[in-house]
Amino acid sequence: MKTYSAKPSEIEKKWWVIDAKNIVLGRLASRVANMLRGKHKPSFTPHLDCGDNIIIINAEHVKLTGKKANPRDGKIYYRYTGFPGGIKDTTAGKILSGKHPERVIKMAVKRMITRNALGAKQMSNLYVYANSDHPHMAQQPTVYDFAGQNPKNKK
């Protein structure tokens, strides 16, 4: 028996909507990363974009466990400006309470996806919104009950 390898014409993408209200960030990000890659499908092919399209709503209400949400000594995100001494930092709590709280989920998922051209294509299938409104109703997304899968997913 030969190993099955999907062709680009055989791939069917599905639309999912996930409500991130009171959901633990790391658990959500790892599940979304697997779904973006397509590893939940039996027809998974590593070199093709066979993952689904995912819409995450209520990103501003995602939960962090432990001391990660603490604004003073919580989870710190670093970036480098390119200049000497140009390391800037911000915390997850500041981002969640700031102007773009959806960036916390996008960064968590992006760091779990492969860092190449295929990973960039898979990340383009992720749509994150801070509140419950999204413009993808025409795609008729299926509701994915992430909170009901495991009691630890919800906080």
Swiss-Prot record:
The keyword Ribosomal protein applies. Belongs to the universal ribosomal protein uL13 family. It comes from Rickettsia akari (strain Hartford). PROSITE patterns: RIBOSOMAL_L13. GO terms for molecular function: mRNA binding; structural constituent of ribosome. One of its GO terms (cellular component) is cytosolic large ribosomal subunit. Keywords: Ribonucleoprotein, Ribosomal protein. Part of the 50S ribosomal subunit. InterPro entries: Ribosomal_uL13, Ribosomal_uL13_bac-type, Ribosomal_uL13_CS, Ribosomal_uL13_sf. It comes from the Bacteria. The keyword Ribosomal protein applies. This protein is one of the early assembly proteins of the 50S ribosomal subunit, although it is not seen to bind rRNA by itself. It is important during the early stages of 50S assembly. This is Large ribosomal subunit protein uL13. One of its GO terms (biological process) is translation. The lineage of its organism: Bacteria, Pseudomonadati, Pseudomonadota, Alphaproteobacteria, Rickettsiales. CDD domains: Ribosomal_L13.
